[in-house]
Amino acid sequence: MTMDHCTENVQIWKRTDIVLTSGREYTNPYADVTLDAVFTHEDGTTIRLYGFWNGGNEFRVRFAPTKTGTWSYETVCSDSENTGLHGQKGKFFAAENTGSTELDRHGFVKISDNGRFFVHEDGTPFYWLGDTNWQAPNYVSLTRCNYPGCTCGNQFLHELNDRLAKGFTVYQTYFDIAESDGGGQRGITPEPGLWKIRHRQINPQTFTEKIDVMFDALADSGMVIALGYGVHSNTTAAMDIEDLKRVSRYLTARYASYPVVWITAQEITGEAQFAAWNVSAEITAAGDGYHHPQGAHQFPLPVDNEYVAALDGKDWHEFFALQAGHGPSRIPKCLYESYWNNRRSGRVKPFVETEANYEDITCGGFNGYAASRIAAWRANLLGSYGFTYGVTGVWANCYSTAGDTGWLGAYSFEPWYMGIDKPGSYEMTYLAKFFRYVDFSTLIPRFNDPAYSDLTEETKLVSSSEDAGTYAAYFCNRDRSSGILKGLVPGKEYSAKWYNPLTGKFAEIGNTVISATGQYTVPDKPTSADWALLVTCRTDLGAYETETIFCGETISAEIPAGAVVQKPEITCSGSHIHTADGVGYNTTDALCDGDRTTEWIPFAPMASQTILMDLKQVKNVCGIRITLGKNAVLPPYRLEGSSGQSGWTILADSTLREASVMENNGFREITEIFSGEYRYIKLLWLGAENNTSVKTIAEIALYAEENV
């Protein structure tokens, strides 16, 4: 919405632009003049903001009212003789927000009164579930989409709609503001760049026609934008400090009135870049009249690191945007505990894990499929009230299998349209579902405190509420052992439930827990997989989904008599390959063509692939036979079923027991027998040892009873 500095009605938490026309011509309006405005509510509340040049003689001040009632404003221009920009006044009325998102109903995000987590303006707890989209303003496209079978023509909206459907609440990104990084993408994206004159004059058209459109879509859909302006020393080495200061002001002017949380830039905690990014952050703080939470994305560092200490001492710094990093090793409990106990600044600061073990990338080792899930659960039980997920192809916008964009072949082996479907993104949905259900803001991490448990191993973690009414634990050990919870209220009735991080469903443990001593000996885990546990005396948490746990039951190799081979519609983005000339092809047709000499071929064998089979109607599915390709390895796999693509049930899991492999005329076959009413069957074909592995499938035969 725009206002030509006249009386208009706007809604709280919604952006409106006050449009001004310069009365003077400037050689470079971006650099030659500055504009500010003060907005004053009828109750005396003031919000100070920067204005920005929007092309030609047009300048704007962007504002989102935070209270209903009458607001007035007055502008200040560095050129006081410019009567079109200086001393302009206006008044408007702000009405209630009629939208339906959490941001519409509860307001912008801020830090809680106890300094531990994020809340909306009205105090409603905000659960941070982020998705990593580094450099998206530059390189994610609004004018093309190469997801297999998609005709939307907008990669950004395709990604956004997917993440909204999965319950993500934060879009984590930064600008490649110097246009000096890009992972091989610079100069090849279809949209124009950020600069008309490199680092000297911004290109307002790019912001108006692309980036504002992106950020409007994010805000209007209820997404908080975790926003930085550049990347470590890459940006600061490429850009003069005065140019960085100017663009920091410009970006703050355009986007401070959005639902943002500032992360300054990626990895600022290094000698070459620290001072420059601190200056940038100070400019942001001075021009953000909303005082959005402000932090800075870090390297993987302990709290006593000299740069972390310096960061902690800055007036503008309010929360820690942690990076656990990547690779097979786990960040120890004590590192998170040190941030939890940190009082260097004299106040408590929240921290959130914003980069840890992106799914299916290689960095310090190959992360694989499960690492993201484990990192997320551990972080949440260790004081991070939320988590930012990242996945191959999406985190750095690798657009296609052709070319070298987004570090393809270096950090990522697959493009965005393969990464977006990874199983980890669904498991983030289940993570958030659990912590919202248990009232995450009431939980306190207990680390290795013997007063609350004997869970001292790095693979066993627990949090509990202050009143001892709720315990949440997580076990990612590879055996079935658990432990003892302590500090329960003696004589109080508790319920105990396992929670499956792979399905988002609970399984009752048994009878009510009543402890005379305040201790509860947790039963062995249902399986050797990772499991969460909820023990609570609360009865007001609401309804929950349950499941019968798949424990790796013994299988039969015999398909039931009367079962008929089906012809499902099959989709798999992990085998959709674009050639250098842009032509796409997929080998999914080979999966159910009845010909074992044709093979389905994944693009990156080291990564996981999801093969989705749609029967078009609910049927009693009886089993599946998978014929491996010639000389193919057998990776770990999991089979799941659903009647409607939500609420998946695990049907088979080779990580819990070995698959039964039979020879049949020179081909190796796996047969899994199960029974249930399903429309969709999902085969998660997990990672092979390396990308030279042959991980092909010659044929899939899915069996079901024919509906009468």
Over which residues does each language-model region extend?
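Extracellular beta-rich ligand/substrate-recognition surface
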Residues: 54, 473-478, 596-609, 658-665
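Aromatic- and carboxylate-lined catalytic core of secreted/periplasmic carbohydrate-active enzymes
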Residues: 4-8, 25, 358-361, 370-510, ...
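Short tyrosine-centred short linear motifs in exposed loops/low-complexity segments
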Residues: 11-14, 57-59, 63-81, 479-481, ...
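Aromatic, loop-rich ligand-recognition surfaces of beta-strand-rich domains
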Residues: 591-652, 666-708
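Predominantly extracellular/luminal regions of secreted and cell-surface proteins
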Residues: 428-437, 553-593
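Catalytic-core region of carbohydrate-active enzymes that cleave or remodel glycosidic bonds
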Residues: 313-402
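Active-site mouth of glycoside hydrolases
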Residues: 103, 108-331
